[in-house]
Amino acid sequence: MALTVNPHAGPSAPDTFHEEALYAFRFDLNCDSHEDVTFKVQFGASAQVDGNEHQHVQAFDVCRAIGGVARKGAEGELIISGHTGQVVKTDGDYRAYAGLAPDLFAGDAVALNVFRKALWKEKRFEPQAFQSRQNFFAKANVTAIVIEIPSPLIGRGLVHGWATASLYGHAPEVQVSRWGLPLITHVFLSDPALKDEAERYNRATPADDVTLFSKPISDFTEKVTRLANSAANPSEYANQILARICPTVLPYELDTPAYFNVARFNGRALTDDVMGVILTLATHTALGDGVAPDKQLLRPDFPYFGEPHT
């Protein structure tokens, strides 16, 4: 399991983890959109490495929580402790890494903004927006958290996962970000008339998704397919997409190869072109932005992210 935070870490964003934050990987085992098993990660204060103001190290702990404590708070069984920038291995075949890494996400963010402006302000479908084929995230770094554990510590068979970041320290716990399926706020919840929709989504849970976000997701899909003239019945197609992506959790059959494609979601590999998949599903056309994750930034073994850009 892997999550990344601090886009463009280094020059314009922190290269450390928030010491009053709780990062979590959450798994629903029975399809009720509530977590049953959670892996919680917390970090200590940052310190300079050998007096270098551009390099920092933090201690971190990973806890596994089940049942009621899986949903809230930092409680759980401590399974891994270590320091950032180093791969941590335990006798139980657990591995963890937290630290600077290359951003493996690929997408033309500028083109997506042009596409959305045409859709919402000019009420037209503009696939030509993606002709520039520029990866906005090329040569960017992030801070990554990567954990590898025996799959029985999660469960068996089909699970549904998502990750969250919450403020957690002196103040009460407040969730500020969540990720399950990619690009939900950037594509399906992008209507500028829906103010603060992204923030509302990031503070919600998957159990809230059907109630809170069914209508805007359906409205977006129906609108874009109608403008693109790509669905015989835009309303019916919107309902099909809604059934597939809401709640916005990532399905995965444990111990099988991960892949995220138009036909099916089964986890998500680091090299999957998720921007192209989501654009294709949202518009019901073979639409992509012409860029894909750079496989040269991977390493074959844990933590799978290669060396950060310098």
Stretches found by the model and what they are:
Residues 1-310:
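Surface-exposed extracytoplasmic segments
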